[in-house]
Design a protein with these regions (language model features):
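Catalytic-loop of the protein kinase fold
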Residues: 90-110
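A conserved short helix/loop substructure at the end of the activation segment
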Residues: 226-238
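Conserved structural core of kinase catalytic domains
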Residues: 23-71
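Conserved C-terminal C-lobe helix
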Residues: 212-226
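Activation segment/activation loop of eukaryotic-type protein kinase catalytic domains
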Residues: 105, 110-146
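Conserved catalytic-loop aspartate of Hanks-type protein kinases
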Residues: 163
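Structural motif at the C-terminus of the N-lobe alphaC helix and the adjacent alphaC-beta4 loop
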Residues: 10-19
Length: 258
């Protein structure tokens, strides 16, 4: 408990100059005081229901039916904000930081509706190998839950690419309003983990790709983040670049037709 709180406070303190991170006000022992945000988190808005449903109950024969009320533009905007915040950790100038627990619930809304990043108690500040001139991979212990990358369930050495995989799961929630493997509820957690270990990825209705420009971009990004081999996944900086370019294109289209 002490180490979790210490890490949460340490990472929060390092980013006090970034107003997109929840601001730490104080820390002592196993307690941390941070700014109060009353607008809820992204998970409750993106996955408004249970997030689990049987395929037949979607009634989507004629068209896909996202289970949230986000517009395509909002989905792209939130995905970009999430990516920028994760990238800030990975690109920290004094050493790469892995969040280690990327979920939609870690992104809180401020008064203006922008996202603020939160909850760094599982963060890992990666060590640097002078001989190899690279960051050292580390072990987390066997992963729990269903938001993790395949290598975590095998307890293999991991790096920041576990955050990339979990970011893809967050994008899935934005896109569909559902959890990955939405037909398997929490009682089937082991079954979900076995699917991920085998390299299976959640079903993405192909109609999402052509539903809108924004959603097509998100499908492409999601599929890239779910590469089984972590070395084949894009880094967060390249994802931020792609999302920013997509948002510029989206804004240009809106301006042209307004």
């Amino acid at each position: 408990m002490f180490e979790f709180t210490r890490m949460d406070a340490l990472v929060s303190e390092r980013f006090t100059s970034n107003n997109r991170f929840v601001d730490i006000l104080g820390h002592c022992g196993v307690s941390m005081l941070s700014e109060y945000l009353s607008k809820g988190n992204l998970e409750k808005a993106a996955v408004a229901g249970s997030g689990f449903i049987k395929q037949a109950d979607l009634h989507d024969q004629d068209d896909v039916k996202p289970q949230n009320k986000f517009s395509a533009a909002a989905k792209l905007s939130y995905a970009l904000q999430m990516a920028e915040l994760i990238a800030a950790l990975h690109d920290y100038p004094h050493g790469k930081i892995v969040h280690n627990d990327i979920q939609l619930s870690q992104f809180l809304f401020d008064q203006s509706g922008m996202l603020k990043f939160n909850d760094f108690n599982r963060a890992e500040i990666m060590l640097w190998d002078e001989q190899k001139q690279d960051y050292c991979r580390y072990r987390n212990g066997p992963g729990g839950g269903n938001n993790r990358a395949p290598e975590e369930y095998y307890d293999k050495p991991v790096n920041e690419k576990i955050d990339v995989f979990s970011f893809g799961n967050g994008v899935y929630g934005l896109l569909t309003g559902l959890w990955p493997f939405y037909e398997l509820d929490e009682d089937h957690e082991t079954e979900m983990q076995e699917k991920l270990k085998r390299g299976e990825t959640p079903f993405v209705d192909p109609r999402y790709h052509n539903r809108s420009f924004e959603e097509g971009i998100l499908v492409d990004i999601m599929n890239a983040t779910w590469a089984y081999d972590p070395d084949d996944r894009p880094d967060m900086i390249s994802l931020v670049t792609k999302l920013r370019l997509a948002k510029l294109e989206m804004d240009k289209h809106v301006s042209k037709h307004s």
